[in-house]
């Protein structure tokens, strides 16, 4: 089936695990060792962005974001073909996925509050960091 950026984080990973999502040609499978977020065209800034936000591994959100960016118009749902709107949806979904991961993985309210500051930095590193942010 076609990828839809409105799917929840859990739905996306469930369908991906079952192999039910049409993937772009040549798009690599998820690899825990390389899928982390940080703009690859700015090494100094990338070094500031961690693989983990406190205890939460967030490469899953980065992988999904890259999947959305790499999805050609033919594999997108009919309701969204415009490139700008599609990228905006992917970016918003990335932020929502980050928040979901933080909420699920970090149990302490004080630690979650700290993590939200990192989420903001992380999100803007992706928005401002170029076309692709994962180290592929």
Regions found by a protein language model. Give the residues of each.
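Extended terminal accessory/targeting regions
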Residues: 1-136
């Amino acid at each position: 089936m076609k990828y839809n950026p409105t799917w929840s984080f859990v739905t996306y990973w469930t369908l991906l695990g079952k192999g039910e999502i049409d993937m772009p040609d040549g798009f690599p499978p998820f690899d825990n060792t390389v899928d982390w977020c940080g703009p690859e065209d700015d090494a100094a800034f990338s070094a500031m962005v961690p693989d983990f936000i406190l205890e939460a591994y967030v490469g899953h959100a980065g992988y999904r974001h890259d999947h959305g960016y790499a999805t050609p118009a033919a594999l997108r749902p009919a309701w969204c073909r415009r490139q700008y709107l599609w990228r905006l949806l992917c970016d918003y979904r990335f932020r929502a996925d980050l928040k979901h991961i933080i909420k699920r993985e970090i149990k302490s309210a004080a630690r979650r509050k700290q993590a939200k500051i990192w989420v903001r930095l992380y999100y803007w590193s992706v928005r401002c960091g170029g076309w692709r942010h994962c180290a592929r």
